[in-house]
Regions:
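Positively charged n-region of N-terminal signal peptides that target proteins for export
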Residues: 1-5
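Bacterial N-terminal signal peptides
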Residues: 6-16
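Hydrophobic small-molecule pocket/channel-lining residues, especially in calycin-type beta-barrels
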Residues: 20-179
Length: 179
């Protein structure tokens, strides 16, 4: 009688064991971006309002590897007709989950934004988090794509319907500066 139950019990035990990431080590996923870049940025002025007004900026992005490659700092400074934007981003690699967390400095609050968590697959990075915009809860998607040795593209989109639809609100195209 017990011999017929043993495989079922074993299966239950196997399924309850903790699962660890089996994917590739992504610690070097951002190595392509280390250095200085010319940045062309387009920003939707009023996201999730139905507005279609975009503003454009030009400037530089500098990416510095820190903590032996387990982290990097991104410094953005761009200017346009709408003024100047300065940004700072901290990216940290988690070797256990094999994912990156991306946090952005909020100049108004002096705090880091909630981290966007994700990874690169097939040459494309996707990172997600939850945030608030004008008092409403939203989802944020950050995508890094079109990666070559001399250029890359960054997009940010918001969703206020649980991820059913996304509105693109930030497009940055970087071109490497020869140093």
């Amino acid at each position: 009688m017990f011999t017929k139950l043993t495989p079922v019990i074993f299966l239950v035990c196997v399924c309850s064991w903790p699962v660890h990431a089996q994917g590739r080590d992504g610690q070097h996923d951002f190595d392509f971006e280390i250095g200085t870049w010319k940045t062309h940025l387009k920003r939707l002025v009023k996201p999730l309002t139905g507005s279609t007004t975009w503003v454009e900026y030009e400037g530089t992005t500098r990416v510095t590897k820190v903590m032996d490659g387990r982290a990097n700092l991104v410094e953005l400074k761009v200017s346009g007709t709408a003024g100047t934007l300065e940004g700072l981003s901290l990216r940290l690699y988690n070797p256990e989950s094999r994912q990156w967390s991306l946090s952005f400095a909020n100049i108004k609050s002096g705090m880091l934004t909630p981290a966007a968590i994700g990874e690169f697959k097939s040459g494309r990075g996707e990172f997600y988090n939850q945030d608030t915009l004008n008092g409403r809860s939203i989802l944020v998607r950050f995508v890094i794509s079109d990666i070559t040795p001399t250029s890359c593209r960054f997009e940010q989109s918001f969703s206020d319907d649980g991820g059913k639809t996304w509105e693109l609100n930030w497009i940055a195209v970087d071109t490497r500066v020869k140093e």
